[in-house]
Regions:
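Active-site nucleotide-donor binding segment shared across nucleotidyl transfer reactions
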Residues: 113-147, 151-157
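Conserved catalytic core of two-metal-ion nucleotidyltransferases
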Residues: 169-204
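Mature, function-bearing regions of proteins
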Residues: 80, 84-87, 194, 198-217
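Helical scaffold of the NTase/Pol beta-like nucleotidyltransferase catalytic core
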Residues: 1-129, 168-175
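Short, conserved charged micro-motifs
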Residues: 156-164
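Extended catalytic-interface subdomain
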Residues: 221-222
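Broad gene-expression machinery/nucleic-acid interaction feature
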Residues: 61-63, 144, 148, 176-178
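Solvent-exposed residues in well-ordered beta-strands and their adjoining turns
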Residues: 67-69, 152-154, 182
Length: 222
């Protein structure tokens, strides 16, 4: 994918070129002096596209986040780069790919979630602790960790089965299941708000959060 076409959608994973890291360190001396960030760069681990500030959006910068593991304080490092600093751009890992990194106690619920996504035509992708543990090999998961998922917004006739299926699995799973349904443009709504049939929901976009009607979100995504 050409760098100029790199998406700025939330939940996108990117890696930086060597020149991109050098530019990021030159722009922010505190970032350059952080040994945890330096180690991240040396390993070539991905970063995740986050919501942009108004200044970042106006400047056309790509807003990124780096969630450091609990062993170094579980800090969330924010930076932004030019589009030509990106080496690769890709989706979050699929649930099927990361399942082996999850605790044994989670496995039955994960299999149910995979089957639910397949029935509804929308495979689950993973962010949060499970994703970062799989991506980096570092320990992120703990006894109180949630499972963070995103699903593409399904066809209208499959929306209720997906939401109600998530609620049923969440009710019996050993971990809390959190996450969003995403439109094609990357805007997302927490699945619990949609499952509760609230008339208005919090829509998270690339640049902010706004209250919209649930119907507007689901209809505009198709």
């Amino acid at each position: 994918m050409p760098h100029a076409d790199a998406p700025r959608r939330r939940h996108t994973l990117v890696t930086l070129t060597a020149a991109g890291w050098r530019a990021a360190f030159a722009r922010d001396p505190l970032l350059a002096a952080d040994p945890c960030v330096r180690r991240w760069a040396e390993h070539g681990w991905p970063l995740i596209v986050r919501r942009a500030s108004p200044d970042e959006a106006a400047a056309g910068r790509v807003p990124l986040g780096m969630p450091l593991p609990p062993s170094v304080g579980k800090r969330r490092v924010a930076l932004n780069v030019a589009a030509d600093a990106l080496a690769t751009v890709g989706p979050l890992p699929a649930l099927a790919d990361v399942r082996a990194a999850a605790p044994d106690a989670w496995q039955p619920a994960l299999r149910e979630l995979e089957a639910l996504g397949a029935r509804c035509g929308v495979p689950a992708h993973v962010f949060g602790s499970l994703a970062w543990q799989w991506l980096t090999g570092e320990t992120y998961l703990g006894a109180s960790s949630d499972l963070d998922l995103v699903f593409p917004l399904p066809d209208a006739d499959r929306l209720a089965p997906l939401l109600d299926g998530l609620a049923a699995i969440d009710a019996r799973a050993p971990m809390r299941i959190d996450g969003e349904l995403l439109r094609d443009d990357g805007a997302g709504v927490n699945w619990r708000e949609l499952q509760a049939r609230l008339p208005e929901v919090a829509l998270k976009t690339a640049t902010g959060v706004e209250l919209v009607s649930a119907a507007l979100f689901t209809e505009a995504g198709r």
